[in-house]
Amino acid sequence: MLLRQYINVPRLGEIMNLKELTVILIIPIVYLGVCGCFEIVPKSFYDNFSSYNVGDKAPFGEWKVKEGGFKIEAILSEDKKTLNKVAVPINNGIIYIDKNYTDFKFIVDIKRLEESDSPKIYFRLINNANAGYYIDIEGFDRGYVLYKFNGTKVEKLAESYDAAPAGTDFYRYEVVAKDNKIIFLAGGQKYIEYTDNNTPILKGGIGIGGGRAYYDNVRVEPIE
């Protein structure tokens, strides 16, 4: 009697209430997962292609192929002292990371093979990269153009007739996407700022390719 007096032994009704509470807590979580209402924000992403072998062809790592092909090559660093692995399109190929980034900074280093080349930067890609936005880095440093596309439909949204003097050197390009505003920078200088008020795409993956160039140091950083 004394032992039972000091030990809190749960009654049957209390056990049932605990089970009911567990069910009540689990059902909404399962529902959120099934309906897609609950979504985990993707973490930051970085790839300098050093973990792959020279000659590897996409898909590799987290990269998927949208069209054409991509391969890993080794080229001399800018100081010509070491070999550096980079990603190169095959037949103007495009590869992409299939994640739902909403607000983010997307940074990539690009080096044209020839001054006439026009590589591209893709972002907020959806539907297996069949829709989204891209920046066209025009050849001969003529400028930059922001496009929105859906399948074969392509719409020019904004452009800059000024451009950084990249030539055939590695240059750092950056896209900042927050809500429906898009900012494009080259070498830290802003060249395009555009607000898409016509059914904007507010989340999606990122991609590279669409023109002859070396790509390196691809980075995506979510922003608040």
From Swiss-Prot:
Membrane topology: Single-pass membrane protein
GO molecular function: hydrolase activity
Sequence intervals crossing the membrane: 21-41
InterPro entries linked to this entry: 3-keto-disaccharide_hydrolase
Domain of life from the UniProt record: Archaea
Keyword Transmembrane helix: yes
Key word Ribonucleoprotein present: no
Pfam families per UniProt: 3keto-disac_hyd
GO cellular component annotations of the record: membrane
Record keywords, A-Z: Membrane, Transmembrane, Transmembrane helix
Main location: membrane
Full protein name: Uncharacterized protein MJ0945
Organism annotation: Methanocaldococcus jannaschii (strain ATCC 43067 / DSM 2661 / JAL-1 / JCM 10045 / NBRC 100440) (Methanococcus jannaschii)
